[in-house]
Amino acid sequence: MHKEFKRTIPGSLKLLKRVLSEWQKLMTPVFWDYKNDAPWWYNERALLSLFAGAIWQSNGWAFEEFTTDKWRMTRQGDRKKGKGRGDIMFGISNTNFVTEAKQCWPILERKSNNALKTLTKAIENAQSEASRLPLYGKRLGIVFATPRLHENNLPYEDEILESFTKGLRKMKNTTLAWFFPAEKRTLNGKDGYRYPGIVLLIKRFAG
């Protein structure tokens, strides 16, 4: 029997505490057959829909895939407004948020440094992209991370996840939630990797 790894860390975004918990519930075996399928095996758009579901379950509202203005930097270093796509705008307890979402697939190894660097780069990129959005609310970068474990490292799976999640807990100024189920952790791809669970990272752009 594997060990379950499951935690939420709201950090400074206390309003999202319930959203994180509801999101974890949507990852559980009640909704998915892990032997053949799991939500974290899908793309950013599909995962964003489950995040929206968690918001609605938390008595909030969500508006996805909308056209919006976005700022970009010209070669001359000036800011120029153009049209773009917003991933999700949502509200909780009279506070509004507008976000940029990304997805990444870090490789888990005996040492977690490289996987954590992949996550750090991804959330920083999402946070930077969020800075281009209009001030419809607090601007957030969101990352859905689906870690993958090579079949050669399967005997050390729990040990590797222990090290990885310990590193997650040390990430600064980042709202986090993760779920690696204990049962039926057998989602194996044809690429020689296992996909044991998912991490959600959220970081606010405060500029």
Segments the model singles out, each with a brief description of its role:
Residues 1-57:
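Interdomain/boundary linker segments immediately adjacent to catalytic/signaling cores
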Residues 87-109:
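Conserved catalytic cores of phosphodiester-cleaving nucleases, focusing on short active-site segments
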Residues 137-207:
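Glycine-rich, aromatic-bearing surface loops/beta-hairpins
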Residues 56-81, 87-91:
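A short acidic/basic microdomain associated with nuclease active sites
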Residues 25-26, 96-98, 140-142:
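Glycine-rich, often proline-containing surface loops adjacent to acidic residues and nearby aromatics
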Residues 101-162:
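Catalytic cores of nucleic-acid endonucleases
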Residues 19, 23-27, 51-55, 59, ...:
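Hydrophobic, Leu/Ile/Phe/Ala-enriched alpha-helical segments that form helix-helix packing faces
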Residues 33-37, 71-75, 104-115:
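Surface-exposed cleft-lining segments at the edges of enzyme active sites
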